[in-house]
């Protein structure tokens, strides 16, 4: 990039090498038509490295459940639940014109924020938030200063297996094999603990937007599996934690699913819940989840450490742990047909949104063997609580984690 200064501090962190761009919104509306703030489709143009980038975006459909709610607590411990209108939301998926394999996941809430990928390179874009200016920064992940250089990992263990490779899917088209898979959908609840609430300066609006950005990316990640991700609830433990969130990730993973079963599921139906915490788990672990437990009334859960300010990295971590719930093992570098994918035991320095052939086969096997009913929405009543896939409680070796 043309060097724009010594460094710049953005929401994503301190960036040393970036290019200032000025996205121009293209509005092909009929004369006299009123332009909405967040149209179903939007197009922007800007220049990167002297090349014109045409960003075509479509509003993310089905990002929120019809009964989407947000819950926080009063000083005396009462639950306060609201049902905000989310129809005119600001989250998009898209592509770069004239690049066949391009992808984009963008929030247009306050300027443009997100990432796009062209010719195998991932670029991030973020508003500079300058008064009377549409200036944005475009940069690569390698140019973001890392506060912690340790390798982040998943705490899950698994047994390596041999797989027959299948064609890697694109972001739009499913392979013939995947087209035979049933359309599935995961109703996801996110729970924010007190440490994460404090980390974001008790700004519930900021936390909510941050989590919605991440789920929007998750939605794109799982699309090639014919699996839809729908956000149903964000709950904030803004006054105090309702479990003891320990630095030992395995201990926290035992406590959170129990709370989900005894408290959460009695008032709000969901297929899966993830705890979001700023507690620094022991060692290199940044995520942990039970393996093959999607739809289990207790163990369909995972825990996520808020280890990065970059939405893509956090979305990949969340997708990784959800992948374990869906029966996916860690990728074996020597047996899986993917250089950089979602399910390695260690978080890649070059984040990927692609599942390997191993993960595809694991998911297919999970659907066939476990027959998880809760993610096949058309066959279930909307007011029923998900039932267990198996009558047996998961063993310790069915716990999988992520290290970064």
Swiss-Prot record:
UniProt subcellular location: Secreted
Peptidase M12B domain mapped to chain residues: 184-379
Gene Ontology CC: one annotated term: extracellular region
Pro-peptide positions on chain: 7-177, 379-404
Transmembrane segments: none
EC number from the UniProt entry: 3.4.24.-
Positions of region (Disordered): 385-404
Known tissue expression: Expressed by the venom gland.
Residue positions of the active site: 321
Protein's UniProt keywords contain Protease: yes
Biased composition (Acidic residues): 394-404
Top-level lineage group: Eukaryota
Primary localization class, coarse: secreted
Pfam families: Pep_M12B_propep, Reprolysin
Keywords: Disulfide bond, Hydrolase, Metal-binding, Metalloprotease, Protease, Secreted, Signal, Zinc, Zymogen
One Gene Ontology molecular-function label: metal ion binding
UniProt similarity note: Belongs to the venom metalloproteinase (M12B) family. P-I subfamily.
Role, per record: This probable venom zinc protease is not hemorrhagic when 3 ug are injected onto the back skin of guinea pig.
Protein name per its UniProtKB record: Snake venom metalloproteinase H5
Organism: Deinagkistrodon acutus (Hundred-pace snake)
């Amino acid at each position: 990039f043309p060097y724009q200064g010594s460094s710049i501090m953005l929401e994503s962190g301190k960036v040393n090498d970036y290019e200032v761009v000025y996205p121009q919104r293209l509005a092909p509306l009929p004369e006299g038509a009123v332009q909405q703030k967040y149209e179903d489709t939007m197009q922007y143009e800007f220049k990167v490295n002297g090349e014109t980038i045409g960003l075509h975006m479509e509003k993310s459909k089905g990002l929120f459940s019809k009964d989407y709610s947000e819950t926080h607590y009063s000083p005396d411990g009462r639950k306060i639940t609201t049902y905000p209108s989310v129809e005119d939301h600001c989250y998009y998926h898209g592509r770069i014109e004239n690049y066949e394999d391009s992808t984009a996941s963008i929030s247009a809430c306050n300027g443009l924020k997100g990432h796009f990928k062209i010719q195998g390179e991932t670029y991030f874009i973020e508003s500079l938030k300058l008064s009377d200016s549409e200036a944005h920064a475009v940069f690569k992940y390698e140019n973001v200063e890392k506060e912690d250089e340790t390798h982040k990992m998943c705490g899950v263990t698994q047994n390596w297996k041999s797989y027959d490779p299948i064609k890697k899917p694109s972001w739009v088209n499913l392979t013939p094999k995947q087209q035979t898979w049933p359309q599935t959908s995961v109703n996801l609840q996110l729970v924010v603990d007190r440490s994460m609430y404090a980390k974001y300066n008790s700004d519930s609006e900021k936390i909510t937007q941050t989590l919605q950005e991440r789920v929007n990316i998750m939605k794109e990640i799982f699309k090639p599996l014919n699996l839809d991700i729908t956000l149903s609830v964000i709950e904030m433990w803004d006054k105090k934690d309702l479990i003891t969130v320990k630095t030992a990730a395995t201990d926290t993973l035992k406590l959170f699913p129990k709370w989900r079963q005894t408290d959460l599921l009695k008032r709000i139906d969901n297929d899966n819940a993830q705890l979001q915490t700023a507690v620094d788990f022991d060692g290199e672990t940044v995520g942990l989840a039970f393996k093959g437990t999607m739809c289990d009334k207790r163990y369909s859960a995972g825990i996520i450490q808020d280890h990065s300010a970059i939405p893509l990295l956090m979305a990949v971590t969340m997708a990784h742990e959800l992948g374990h719930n869906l029966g996916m093992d860690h990728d074996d570098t020597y047996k899986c047909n993917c250089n950089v994918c979602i399910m390695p035991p260690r978080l890649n320095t070059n984040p990927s949104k692609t599942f390997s052939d191993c993960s595809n086969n694991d998911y297919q096997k999970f659907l066939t063997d476990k027959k998880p009913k809760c993610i096949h929405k058309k066959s279930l009543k909307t007011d029923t609580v998900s039932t267990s896939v198996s009558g047996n409680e998961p063993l310790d070796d069915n716990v999988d984690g992520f290290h970064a």
